[in-house]
């Protein structure tokens, strides 16, 4: 990758804790990454706005598929392309394996300390989301 990322953290205490936690884990940005970052800030706003609209359409498709399932509660993301879904009393222990049987790759929340939750990455094309939504619905019905 371009090896160039940053975080804007207004809270002093949180910013200090963040710096301590990433020290030694991340590399410094390289010149190519800095050039790309500069171009993005100068000319990338339309692309960004288009991307946000695209991702929101994907999110809406997923939410429509999930909303009819009383045992699934999605948590609408604030600033990411990862949708968390809380599952009420799933019969299956291995959620990742269950969803894979339906052709959907999810992350089991247990990896992140969130038992009975799944994480869905919706940063893909609309066609994939439409297919995945139908598969997710089937997986939820048989959960």
Segments predicted by a language model, with ranges:
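Short hydrophobic/aromatic beta-strand micro-patches
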Residues: 8, 84-86, 121-123
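Conserved glycine-rich beta-strand-loop-beta hairpin in the small C-terminal domain of fold type I
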Residues: 38, 47, 54-63, 73-86, ...
